[in-house]
Amino acid sequence: MDVNILTMFVTVSALALACSLWIASYLRNWRKKGVYPPVVGTMLNHAINFERLHDYHTDQAQRYKTFRVVYPTCSYVFTTDPVNVEHILKTNFANYDKGTFNYDIMKDLLGDGIFNVDGDKWRQQRKLASSEFASKVLKDFSSGVFCNNAAKLANILAQAAKLNLSVEMQDLFMRSSLDSICKVVFGIDINSLSSSKAESGPEASFAKAFDVANAMVFHRHMVGSFWKVQRFFNVGSEAILRDNIKMVDDFLYKVIHFRRQEMFSAEKENVRPDILSRYIIISDKETDGKVSDKYLRDVILNFMVAARDTTAIALSWFIYMLCKHQHVQEKLLEEIISSTSVHEDQYSTECNDIASFAQSLTDEALGKMHYLHASLSETLRLYPALPVDGKYVVNEDTLPDGFKVKKGDSVNFLPYAMGRMSYLWGDDAKEFKPERWIQDGIFHPKSPFKFPAFQAGPRTCLGKDFAYLQMKIVAAVLVRFFKFEAVKTKEVRYRTMLTLHMNEDGLNVQVTPRLNSD
């Protein structure tokens, strides 16, 4: 018996020693390859912190620059390290793509558009879009549209000021931005900003359906694969999504058909400047007239989805920051006045003066507004339109900080959290401080891997300059004619979505006309 016990003891000890040696060897080899980022939670933590999700990520990022949240299907890796961001978006770009998960979720709305595809489809569309966004014709056309819609928005605020009414700015910016984008993208006046528009008209129906479809697609991210069951049976949110996408498609296909007919009968020199018209011409040349309406539908809808939210959300948070920092508002006013040809005694809050001031915002005038550019960038630093963005790992890789990611992992960078990291922006990182972008009176941009509000690398946002152009025109007109003060109700918070919308209450402000006596 004693021999058996001794034998068992020796055997167990030997096995334990062998296991220990194997584990030690395994860990040494693992470290050479890179280790997984520390786990800070599971999908349960995401669910518990859903209402403050981006702040939850920020809290974790203050402990670890790179960390993991574990889900049953895969690991979600998050990073705020600019070196990792550069690796993902540029250095090893080919190893990180959109993935089939996101593609499936977005396909019904975005189709095979540029923001929903990888590989050759993406490269082909990127090449064509790059050429178009560099054209002077499109820029001049867009500038005129932005100026006109900024004036319309300012006139609505002027009427509210006369009646001493507060206004909800996020809703106004969303509608104004939709008007601008629809005009630039497919040359149609939606007029969603106008209170006199026909609520039952096709343009109004399209605008509503477009908003609902966006919301329902986001809902798919929240319910996991269950949306596929709902879609199969056409029930719940999927039934709503299908109905609204049909309304969006019906409207867009009619616009495309009408534009084709219009261009077929028009003289070549009378080419319209909107994106749809230009894409029809260029695509028909490249495909010998065989470009499909579905391709055109995907192209213009992708541009709409990307452009609409970016500017509207940024402008909403910009006005919120001005309400909290009145000295910035006054400093901006001084710069805007000194940068334009419209003098103090030549304007009032009447319609014609607002319109003429908007038209005075030339490239030269806007180029002088360094503090305005800095203020908008500072807003985007703290409140990026896309607070979380990520890719899927194609093949196992090791990030520059030494952490390993495996095939199928979701690797995400955190623009919202990055804007609040003291190791990136200093001890005052959480403060709204436009001066951090200014050197000797001149705006100085930051590395896009530190400030990825417009992505970086090969997928850098093609519409970045157009977004700044629209934001600067709208901001200059509004600050020039009005002073903004927040209406003290509930605290302004974000609503956890794909984009950084304010919560349901939006941003209620009181606007006061800036009179000559100011």
UniProtKB/Swiss-Prot annotation:
Query: Gene3D superfamilies attached here?
Result: Cytochrome P450
Sequence intervals crossing the membrane: 5-25, 299-319
Task: Report the membrane topology from the UniProt record.
Answer: Multi-pass membrane protein
One Gene Ontology cellular component: membrane
Q: What is its EC number?
A: 1.14.-.-
Which gene codes for it? CYP704C1
Q: Which family does it belong to?
A: Belongs to the cytochrome P450 family.
One Pfam match, given by its short name, reads p450
Instruction: Spell out the subcellular localization from the entry.
Output: Membrane
Chief location of this protein within or outside the cell: membrane
GO MF terms, alphabetically ordered: heme binding; iron ion binding; monooxygenase activity; oxidoreductase activity, acting on paired donors, with incorporation or reduction of molecular oxygen
Provide the protein name.
Cytochrome P450 704C1
Q: Where does heme bind?
A: 461
Q: Which UniProt keywords apply?
A: Heme, Iron, Membrane, Metal-binding, Monooxygenase, Oxidoreductase, Transmembrane, Transmembrane helix
Q: Which SUPFAM superfamilies match?
A: Cytochrome P450
**Disulfide-bonded cysteines:** none
What this protein needs as a cofactor is: heme
